[in-house]
């Protein structure tokens, strides 16, 4: 088989199963409104949960820092790319979340890959929730460690897998809030089982940090537990981009030596780090609390109004509200019907979600108003198929 045939066959297979992804060009897409092809839509696909991507205080912080530092970091943090802005943000994050250290990464994908590839060795075992993010599962598959996956949020299955003899170390992997189902993991119970078997726990709280818990400290804080490794990302609740790993002093020093995604990547711009510090200040403030409360009220309004007899509404009380419709074509047609009526919604299909669970992934944000939720419900219940 030639290279071209391999490429063509893969694309043909995606088209045949209605799983071919496409990108849309938008002129505005993070906030309440999405604008594409000159038309304005109510936006129910954004991860900007607290509406901070448009916050004037955060925008101003980035602009001022860009004037001071320039628009790029100039290199890896191990060479010349670790500025006072990076250092300040790491210290603020560590203090906020109660860890000795925080290390910044350019993305959540990079952070997850870096931690797993740096830590896991031959004879080790990774025990991950089946619905863990692609960045975690890909890193686990590429590592020399054995990967076992437990049934989603099934702590009994997790316990059985950990009981199996392992000559090396074991790492349990879970998420605070799952990106496609919107539900939370029973983290306190998972941690108890993990420690019983002398393993470590990694929690990716990309969709919980900033949005849940006191001062937005996230899902782990809300459940009263602290994993050995906490990954937080900044493209959702923070409204910016990037990520950080929270850990012990010794693990931070280890990652600085052996995490290749950190050592060999240009660090985020100092202006981005300063904008993230400004975002953190808003998240921790009374304004941040008000934004979280408004978002929670909007989620309740949506769940109370949706017609559960027509859609499978998952047990999600986060900003992520998936409506499982099953069939790929049905999901695509529903998304298109909603767009025709002014609501921008994403149809999520395999391989992002398991076969037979295609869905509309609705995301609500603080930028929405109650009337927007009512309009979404009206359009959902009236959408033709």
UniProtKB/Swiss-Prot annotation:
It catalyses: 6-carboxyhexanoyl-[ACP] + L-alanine + H(+) = (8S)-8-amino-7-oxononanoate + holo-[ACP] + CO2. The modification N6-(pyridoxal phosphate)lysine is found at residue 236. It comes from the Bacteria. Homodimer. NCBIfam families: bioF. Catalyzes the decarboxylative condensation of pimeloyl-[acyl-carrier protein] and L-alanine to produce 8-amino-7-oxononanoate (AON), [acyl-carrier protein], and carbon dioxide. This is 8-amino-7-oxononanoate synthase.
């Amino acid at each position: 088989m030639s290279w071209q045939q391999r490429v063509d066959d893969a694309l043909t297979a995606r088209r045949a199963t209605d799983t071919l992804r496409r990108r849309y060009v938008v002129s505005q897409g993070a906030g309440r409104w999405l604008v594409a092809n000159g038309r304005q839509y109510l936006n129910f696909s954004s991860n900007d949960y607290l509406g901070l991507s448009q916050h004037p205080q955060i925008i101003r912080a980035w602009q001022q820092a860009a004037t001071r530092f320039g628009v790029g970091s100039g290199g890896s943090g191990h060479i010349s790319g670790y500025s006072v802005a990076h250092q300040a943000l790491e210290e603020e994050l560590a203090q906020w979340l109660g860890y000795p250290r925080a290390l910044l990464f350019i993305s959540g994908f990079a952070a997850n890959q870096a931690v797993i590839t740096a830590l896991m060795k031959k004879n080790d075992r990774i025990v991950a929730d089946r619905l863990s993010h692609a960045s975690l599962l890909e890193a686990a598959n590429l590592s020399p460690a054995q990967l076992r996956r437990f049934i989603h949020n099934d702590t009994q299955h997790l316990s059985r897998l950990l009981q199996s003899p392992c000559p090396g170390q074991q790492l349990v992997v879970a998420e605070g809030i799952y990106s496609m189902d919107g539900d939370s993991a029973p983290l306190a119970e998972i941690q108890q089982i993990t420690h019983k078997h002398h393993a470590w726990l990694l929690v990716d709280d990309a969709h919980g940090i900033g949005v849940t818990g006191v001062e937005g400290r996230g899902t782990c804080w809300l459940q009263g537990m602290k994993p050995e490794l906490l990954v937080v990302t900044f493209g959702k609740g923070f409204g910016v981009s990037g990520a950080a790993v929270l850990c012990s002093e010794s693990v931070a020093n280890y990652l600085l030596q052996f995490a290749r995604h950190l050592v060999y990547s240009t660090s985020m711009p100092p202006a981005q780090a300063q904008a993230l510090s400004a975002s953190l200040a808003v998240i921790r403030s009374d304004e941040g609390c008000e934004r979280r409360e408004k978002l929670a009220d909007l989620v309740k309004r949506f769940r109370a109004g949706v017609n559960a007899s027509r859609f499978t509404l998952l047990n999600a009380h986060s900003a992520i509200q998936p409506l499982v419709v099953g069939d790929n074509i049905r999901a695509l047609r529903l998304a298109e019907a909603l767009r025709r009526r002014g609501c921008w919604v994403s149809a999520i299909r395999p391989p992002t979600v398991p076969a037979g669970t295609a869905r509309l992934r609705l995301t609500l944000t603080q930028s929405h108003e109650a009337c927007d939720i009512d309009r979404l419900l009206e359009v959902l219940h009236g959408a033709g198929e």
